[in-house]
């Protein structure tokens, strides 16, 4: 998780610095952090484009149009480099959102090690069906080194 936190330091998001590291057999396959897509201005430079929406349960959510999540950036980096991530693990500073979790499932990620819990309840049913493990990491020493 130490490397994952270092990757998060590259984030250009004003709302949360999130990092992701995809690993197989103790080798880093790809990294990602949250920020603007290539060629777009960064939130750090021009501010966030926040929109609000309601969940099916009526909870208010705020998201940024400008931001691509760390997990998606890591998946994109692997794809650009022709690196298969099937059967790999991902270390993320925060629990993935439901959209990133679905993408991770479809890429063949087997385990998600996460630091800060974020809307964990939204992933429980999907986790049961997909078999992708969600593994909390409370300290840098509680998971295999990324």
Task: For the regions a language model picked out, list residue spans one by one.
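Zinc-dependent deaminase catalytic domain
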Residues: 1-146
């Amino acid at each position: 998780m130490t490397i994952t936190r270092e990757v998060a330091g590259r984030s250009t998001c004003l709302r949360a610095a999130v990092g992701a590291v995809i690993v197989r057999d103790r080798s880093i396959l790809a990294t990602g952090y949250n920020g603007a897509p290539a060629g777009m201005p960064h939130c750090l430079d021009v501010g966030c484009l926040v929109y609000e929406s309601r969940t099916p349960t009526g909870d208010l959510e705020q998201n940024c149009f400008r931001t691509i999540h760390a997990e998606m950036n890591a998946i994109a980096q692997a794809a650009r480099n022709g690196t298969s991530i099937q059967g790999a693990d991902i270390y993320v500073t925060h629990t993935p959102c439901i959209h990133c979790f679905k993408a991770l499932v479809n890429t063949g990620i087997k385990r998600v090690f996460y630091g800060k819990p974020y809307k964990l309840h939204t992933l429980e049913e999907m986790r049961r069906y997909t078999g992708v493990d969600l593994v909390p990491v409370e300290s840098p020493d509680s998971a295999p080194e990324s």
